């Protein structure tokens, strides 16, 4: 594995008497990491802790170097405006001029195949198109780390394939990818490394092919058996 870009030590999140994330320790160094686990295992919560949307009740996250980040959710928020303006919004917050914002936003929409829908109200787009707008909005910011939480969970197969293509293109541009998915085929196509979480604890962290061919724990073996078609 490459040098770690994130070291997590004893990370925990407790709500009342419930431990949602329970003493997670791991180092992330792969360019493309997919977090797998059963429903309620803590996958999305872990990603939100890493992105800073939630504050841990214990442990620490250490970044050897600061990485610019963007996060895309299963159901992205679309502003009540055009697809183009949705992408421009983030660029404007980053301090680009109006001319730069429009140029960069149009380029980003073109990269996800939506240049022809730039002036369409974003909330009238299909679910797959909205997810591509969200990816364009994130990609326009040139993040060094892109975090994706179930980016294709609500999409049809064709839209899912298109989103996968875009994720791979973003990775090819140099960004690190950290994502969750329930689609095992998708995980195998995208990931270099699998982190398997169960009941808030990291159970396995292995190269993708090793995880799918020789899972080391009963929990992972059971998960693959239950989730495989």
What are these regions, as identified by a protein language model?
Residues 146-149:
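Catalytic Walker B motif of ABC-type/P-loop ATPase nucleotide-binding domains
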Residues 51:
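Helix-to-loop junction immediately C-terminal to a conserved catalytic motif
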Residues 181-182:
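H-loop/switch region of ABC-family ATPase nucleotide-binding domains
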Residues 99-117:
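Conserved ABC ATPase "signature" region
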Residues 121-125, 129:
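Conserved ABC ATPase signature
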């Amino acid at each position: 594995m490459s040098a770690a870009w994130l070291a997590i030590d004893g990370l925990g999140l407790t709500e009342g008497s419930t431990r949602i994330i329970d003493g997670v320790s791991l180092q992330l160094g792969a360019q493309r990491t997919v977090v797998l686990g059963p429903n309620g295992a803590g996958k999305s919560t872990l990603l939100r802790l890493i992105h800073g949307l939630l504050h841990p009740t214990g442990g620490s996250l250490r970044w050897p170097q600061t990485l610019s980040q963007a996060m895309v959710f299963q159901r992205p928020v679309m502003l009540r405006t055009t697809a183009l303006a949705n992408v421009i919004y983030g660029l404007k917050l980053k301090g680009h001029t109006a001319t730069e914002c429009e140029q960069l936003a149009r380029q980003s929409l073109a990269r996800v195949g939506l240049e022809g829908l730039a002036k369409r109200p974003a909330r009238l787009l299909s679910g797959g198109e909205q997810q591509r707008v969200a990816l364009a909005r994130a990609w326009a910011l040139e993040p060094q780390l892109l975090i994706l939480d179930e980016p294709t969970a609500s999409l049809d197969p064709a839209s899912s394939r298109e989103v996968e293509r875009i994720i791979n293109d973003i990775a090819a541009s140099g960004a690190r990818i950290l994502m969750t998915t329930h689609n095992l085929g998708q995980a195998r196509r995208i990931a270099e490394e699998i982190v398997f979480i169960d009941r808030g604890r990291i159970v396995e962290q292995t190269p993708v092919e090793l995880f799918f061919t020789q899972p080391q724990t009963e929990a992972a073996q059971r998960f693959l058996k239950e989730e495989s078609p």
